[in-house]
Amino acid sequence: MAIAELRGQISPEWAVVNGHHLERQVKLKNFGQAMALANRIAEIAERQGHHPDLLVSWGRLTVTLFTHAIDGLHQNDFIMAARIDALLRPSVP
């Protein structure tokens, strides 16, 4: 599947950077919330065996996804992005 097709399956908040990686910044209220989200993403990453780069700063988490083995984007990066999107979606009671 082409990047353009896969791109349509994830949140528009993800940027495709130089055709090489996906990046999304999530704004949060404080450092603790950013760290908590990073830990939740880490749990998903461990289960999937696909690990994003996570940059935690005050009130912000930057998530970067690419496949190291090919030094670029793979379908697995988009699958992981969709899983992160699901985590960030507000739950409906």
Q: At which residue positions do the language-model features occur?
A:
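Long, contiguous binding/interaction regions
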Residues: 1-93
